[in-house]
Amino acid sequence: MSSLRLDLAYATVESAISTMEDPIRQAHDLLHNRTGAGSEFTGWLQLPKTYDRAEFARIIDAADRIRASSDVLLVIGIGGSYLGARAAIDMLSHSFHNQLPRSRRPGCAVLFAGHNISSAYLSDLFDILDGKDVSVNVISKSGTTTEPAIAFRLIRRWMEKKYSPDEVRRRIFATTDRAKGALKRLADEQGYETFVVPDDVGGRFSVLTTVGLLPIAAAGIDITALLAGARDAMAEYANPSLATNACYRYAAARNLLYRQGKQVELFVAYEPSLQHLAEWWKQLYGESEGKEGKGIFPASVLFSTDLHSMGQYIQEGQRMLMETVVRFDKPRRELTIPPAEDDSDGLNFLAGKTVDFVNQKAFAGTLLAHVDGQVPNMIISVPEQNAYHLGQLFYFFEKACGVSGYLLGVNPFDQPGVESYKRNMFALLGKPGFEKEKAALEARLPR
């Protein structure tokens, strides 16, 4: 199949890309020789080729059983433990897949929990689950991450009231550490089927592991094609030469733009089904690069919707923005605009044109307007909205992220900053061992 295409003609740095050849090669060597910071978490690099075939077969089998026995798969996880799966399911499924009758979708409905601490959301979720057959995939390497742990406590009790002990065992699947952790212990005690979160793959890079693959497969998506796309991308982006490696050209371009003061990168999509791909991308780049006082701030917009809210700022606000546009050569579905007898909206000049034709012209017009407004654009064109090309896209962004982090001079595979809010939250909640911090924090809060 054809590959993704990167167009830097509107990025304003294309002529300077060759100056990044040596830094790119150095970053490539750090990544591939596993000599860079965080190298113990680079298992994702070869994963599309070296993945565990036996576990993959178990994923397919479990997904078949979930689809056969359940109206709903409830996925419990946060961050990298759910964003990749949600991105894939939203991008590759019917826009209203959960609302379709079962006979018109290839998998069960997929709902999510454990990605917030909202009592209203969880209560509303139980309303939706009432009267339905449910399977659960709880995803947590440790089993102690606050949001999914709270959600799983509640969901587990609900499942135990609804089903017999044997049925609960058959319906709960735990994706967790191979040998240790609270969730692994609980799963072994209760007899839940378990899948492994690899030790050498961090959460935000884990979409092509069991973390992402089981929910994606349960939704009826072809995970063999997803991995095939990633595997072909792995081969295509193995050469460090900027002349042939689009993934590295993207990493080089965004770093050049950052050095020119473009501190905010907007992920731009013209399909609403890419909303959670944008969320996945934001975590990938934000957690990987935002440290040591450095990093491009990742944000996202959905056009044309956000042209009616953020368009003014992008066009004429602070000149700190760059855009990465993900677009498709071919829409997943198409409609033709009909003529209207009265032409009261003045749009008969579009009669006979497709809706996607209008969307593509919106893209072209916006591209030129933003470039004229000094917002550089990097364009990634994807041949089709399918599993194979999403696999390519996942790998493209993951590898570009690793290299980009090394170009920036940071460890792209850790996230030390996230511990600060957790310590404060645990102290304020009264977790044992945090008594001194609790008193100090409460003294700073409004009374």
From Swiss-Prot:
The active site is at 287 (proton donor), 308, 422. It comes from the Bacteria. GO terms for cellular component: cytosol. It catalyses: alpha-D-glucose 6-phosphate = beta-D-fructose 6-phosphate. Pathway: Carbohydrate biosynthesis; gluconeogenesis; Carbohydrate degradation; glycolysis; D-glyceraldehyde 3-phosphate and glycerone phosphate from D-glucose: step 2/4. Its EC number is 5.3.1.9. Pfam families: PGI. The keyword Cytoplasm applies. Keywords: Cytoplasm, Gluconeogenesis, Glycolysis, Isomerase. It is found in: Cytoplasm. One of its GO terms (biological process) is gluconeogenesis. Signal peptide: none annotated. GO terms for molecular function: carbohydrate derivative binding; glucose-6-phosphate isomerase activity; monosaccharide binding. The keyword Isomerase applies. InterPro entries: G6P_Isomerase, Phosphoglucose_isomerase_CS, SIS_dom_sf, SIS_PGI_1, SIS_PGI_2. Belongs to the GPI family. Catalyzes the reversible isomerization of glucose-6-phosphate to fructose-6-phosphate. This is Glucose-6-phosphate isomerase. It comes from Heliobacterium modesticaldum (strain ATCC 51547 / Ice1).
